[in-house]
């Protein structure tokens, strides 16, 4: 290879390298705010941490949230799927706090372990709405509202239904074997329905 061809190849390689480094760096810094809508859109920013997508009900719940918190309805949705891990939800909530969302909405995977991150949201002045399942915290002022079911009543109703059903079929106590599917351990739904 002659000298001019080597210089040409080196020049091309340097240009490609320069383009790669430029594309990966500083001209448009990637900050946590990049997910946020432009301020002139005047949208309410909602950070939602869904516990996962383990069932058709949860998928329908997620779809409902996406439809409700749409741009057409005046919202900008930041959505996170925690994949059944509390640490993922805590990380998402902290990300929402750092992005200064207007509201945080989440369905907690488990009942305990939320005091610290909810205190952080409260200190940041961000209202927290808990949906479906609830949390067990020392200070209920750490969240604004809980939207959910009476899980204990659901469990009682299911037990009464089963008792009536078996009685109607004339089963005796020694003829029945029952398997109870409880769901996520330590979730308010599981705790309430099995009390």
In which residue ranges do the predicted regions lie?
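A residue-level marker of the well-folded mature domains of exported/periplasmic proteins
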Residues: 5, 24-195
């Amino acid at each position: 290879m002659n000298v001019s061809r080597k210089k040409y190849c080196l020049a091309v390689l340097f240009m490609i390298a320069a383009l790669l480094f430029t594309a990966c760096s500083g001209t448009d810094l990637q900050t946590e705010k990049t997910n946020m809508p432009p301020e002139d859109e005047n949208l309410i920013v909602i950070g939602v941490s869904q516990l996962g997508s383990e069932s058709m009900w949860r998928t329908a719940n997620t779809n409902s949230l996406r439809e409700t918190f749409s741009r057409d309805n005046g919202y900008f949705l930041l959505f996170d799927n925690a994949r059944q891990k509390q640490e993922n939800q805590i990380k998402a909530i902290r990300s929402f706090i750092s992005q200064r969302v207007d509201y945080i909405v989440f369905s907690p995977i488990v009942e305990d372990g939320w005091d610290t991150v909810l205190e952080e949201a409260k200190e940041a002045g961000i209202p927290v709405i808990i949906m479906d399942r609830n949390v067990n915290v020392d200070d209920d002022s750490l969240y604004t509202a809980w939207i959910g079911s009476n899980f204990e009543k659901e469990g009682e109703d299911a037990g009464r239904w089963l008792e009536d059903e078996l009685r109607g079929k004339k089963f005796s106590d020694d003829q029945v074997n029952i398997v109870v599917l409880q769901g996520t351990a330590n979730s308010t739904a599981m705790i309430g329905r099995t009390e």
